[in-house]
Design a protein with these regions (language model features):
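Amphipathic alpha-helical packing segments from all-alpha helical-bundle domains
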Residues: 22-23, 43-70, 80-95, 118-128
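Membrane-interface aromatic/basic loop that binds lipid-linked glycans or pyrophosphate carriers
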Residues: 129-135
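Amphipathic alpha-helical segments used for helix-helix packing
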Residues: 25-47, 95-102
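Short helix-coil transition/hinge motifs at the ends and kinks of transmembrane helices
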Residues: 69-74, 100-114
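Surface-exposed helix-capping loop/turn segments at secondary-structure junctions
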Residues: 7, 66-74, 135
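Hydrophobic alpha-helical connector segments
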Residues: 1-29, 79-86
């Protein structure tokens, strides 16, 4: 996803999740590889993936700083931990989404996908509600 993605008008959690899952579907093989090798691959691959995710995490941290509801978080490390958490959650969401596409067909798939989007949105909302009260 590009930085332009974050500048969409009327962006909300559900729209963000839909865009995210569309990106996952377009690049499912890459997601599967990254997820499988991030924890289960050779040390060389695990280290390479860790190096590759650091700039993503740092970039997300910068994006989070721009969000009005994050302005009260002054500790840079706290924002970085939040970015890491979101990156980790994205790997879980991606693999679960890919698994849905493999397990279900037709209208069952659409129904399961909608339920999963709602679940992911609730997870994000709960996370950000907690952050709103972070001191």
């Amino acid at each position: 996803l590009s930085h332009d993605y974050f500048k969409q008008p009327n962006m909300n959690a559900e729209t963000s999740m839909v865009f995210f899952f569309q990106a996952v579907e377009k690049n499912a093989a890459a997601w599967i590889f990254m997820i499988a090798e991030r924890w289960g691959g050779s040390v060389l691959l695990r280290d390479a993936i860790a190096r590759a995710t650091k700039p993503l995490t740092a970039g997300l941290c910068l994006d989070l700083k721009q969000i009005k509801s994050m302005q009260h978080i002054k500790n840079e490390q706290d924002l970085y931990v939040l970015a890491q958490t979101l990156i980790d959650m994205s790997f879980t969401w991606a693999m679960s989404w890919i698994s849905l596409n493999r397990q279900f067909q037709d209208e069952n798939l659409s129904e399961k996908q909608q339920l999963y989007i709602q679940q992911a949105v609730i997870q994000v909302q709960l996370l950000f509600r907690g952050i709103a009260n972070w001191q």
